[in-house]
Amino acid sequence: IKVVVPRADTYEETVVSFLRRAIEVAQAQGQEAHIALTGGNTAEAVYRHWSTYPDQPKPPLAIYLSDERCVPTHHSGSNHGMVRRSLFSNSLPAGIRMVTPDVSDPRSAAREYDQRLPSTFDLLLFTLGVDGHFASLFPGELNSLVQSGRVAVTVGPPPFTGRVSLT
């Protein structure tokens, strides 16, 4: 589903509604919901908005990342760290888990992360960067991908050049 939000002032609320609904539908079938979240300033605003809900997000829930920079999770450039800080104030509630790549060795991380991904997601959230990048797939860089199944090692602009990305 492609969602176009006509008014910027309703963007966060609209996206949070989609996230909540996808999780509810999966959990109504008695299963853990599987969602992939993205990084970036736009997404961070959505997660901060979502964190204001008293019942935000409900377990059982597995959160994956559409892409991650090859930096430690406590680094300001880490998408994992950004999601934890903005959505959960750094503390994951019981029954919610983050499944993220170990980016210390990007090529191994891509293979290992691909094996940990579910066969299907209940929702994948992506935004488009001002330079046209999607996840960590950058225009003009597709020939340099080192792919392992559904995950690739990519090269982005400095300062975070190494990345692991869904494809």
Predicted regions span which residues?
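N-terminal glycine-/serine-/threonine-rich phosphate-binding loop
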Residues: I1-I35, R107
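Short glycine-/acidic-enriched loop or helix-start segments at secondary-structure transitions
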Residues: V46-R48, H75, F134-F138
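A glycine- and small-aliphatic-rich helix-loop capping segment at beta-alpha/alpha-beta transitions
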Residues: H49-K58, G81-R85, P139-S148
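Glycine-rich beta-strand-to-loop/alpha-helix junction loops that act as flexible
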Residues: L37-T42, F126-V130
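Short, conserved beta-strand segments within well-ordered enzyme catalytic domains
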Residues: H34-T38, A62-L65
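Ligand-binding beta-strand-loop-alpha-helix segment within the catalytic cores
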Residues: K58-L125
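Class I SAM-dependent methyltransferase SAM-binding "motif I" and its flanking Rossmann-like core
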Residues: L124-F126, V130-T167
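Generic structural signal for well-ordered alpha-helical scaffold segments
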Residues: V16-Q27, Y47, S51, R84-F88, ...
